[in-house]
């Protein structure tokens, strides 16, 4: 029916808008995640976990993912401003 088609179109449009907003804020969310993880890494180091335990390795992997998101997001922002 026409009503269902309109609802579907609205949902797709809303999904695109949410996706754009999430993409725009991705670098900030990644920075917040990094700031949340730093105390954990510091505690692990104090506890002698600097021997590359699984937990520390996982946290470092997450930091690298977040850093890549920040880099990608900032490149997009700079490209739009040029």
Say what each PLM segment does.
Residues 1-24, 28-31, 53-81:
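Long, amphipathic alpha-helical coiled-coil segments characteristic
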Residues 33-36:
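C-terminal helical "lid" subdomain and adjoining coupling/linker elements of P-loop NTPases
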Residues 39-49:
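Hydrophobic, amphipathic alpha-helical faces that serve as interaction scaffolds
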């Amino acid at each position: 029916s026409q009503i269902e088609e309109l609802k579907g179109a609205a949902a797709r449009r809303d999904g695109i808008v949410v996706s754009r907003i999430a993409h725009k804020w991705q670098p900030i969310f990644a920075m917040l995640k990094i700031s949340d993880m730093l105390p954990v890494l510091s505690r692990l180091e104090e506890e002698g976990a600097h021997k590359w335990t699984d937990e520390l390795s996982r946290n470092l992997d997450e930091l690298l993912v977040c850093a890549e998101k920040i880099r990608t997001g900032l490149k997009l922002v700079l490209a739009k401003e040029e």
